[in-house]
């Protein structure tokens, strides 16, 4: 994933110093894009080992429409712990918006179900969009959505996805987000009888926290390994029926994990 390292190097060399909500401080650039051809391998970072279990379970948690960390905790995933209240609740975050977006007239929209139906019925539509950014509920969320909106595109029997990430924590968050949405693209492609195409990652405020600079420099000294393969259980034909056991990662070789603090 040389593209990811190129982004990290660009921010280190050309980024502007900025303050931020957490008080940590960042080095930041505005606007960046990376494209991953999913036929060439699963875009899971190899210059530091990632916890694939957390990536898969978090995505399944989103798809369930869940907004309480109990499911994550039950499966050994702690990435949302810092933002949950004493009951484990996060407010109307991703799962709520993906599955139960509340309209002005009181209806509830299942954006994921609507998306699948739209891709199957009218693949050439330019409206295959899911948004997690709900201005009416942002203030009630423990953390407003960083990966805010994604769009699917069908051409030549292949399904591609583009994500817009308004706030991109390059060292900790972005590797998870790339893998998560690449996996979602593969899942949606399978249930819609399409082949995975490209995953396009588009970032807004792309930043390295000041307490991640040393770790970023360390990672830039490492040479990427070939990408692994992600195998999905071909018998699953319903997006909402996928389970953790339906995913098999093959050939993942990675450099050791690099620890870094989370900015809350």
Swiss-Prot record:
Q: Which Gene3D superfamilies match?
A: Thymidylate synthase/dCMP hydroxymethylase domain (3.30.572.10)
Q: Which reaction does it catalyse?
A: dUMP + (6R)-5,10-methylene-5,6,7,8-tetrahydrofolate = 7,8-dihydrofolate + dTMP
Which residues are listed for (6R)-5,10-methylene-5,6,7,8-tetrahydrofolate binding in this entry? 51, 169, 263
CDD domains reported in the protein's UniProt record = TS_Pyrimidine_HMase
Residues that coordinate or bind dUMP:
21, 126-127, 166-169, 177, 207-209
Q: Where in the cell is it found?
A: Cytoplasm
Subunit note: Homodimer.
Q: What is this protein called?
A: Thymidylate synthase
What organism is the protein native to? Azoarcus sp. (strain BH72)
Phylogenetic placement of the source organism: Bacteria, Pseudomonadati, Pseudomonadota, Betaproteobacteria, Rhodocyclales
- Per the record, the gene is thyA
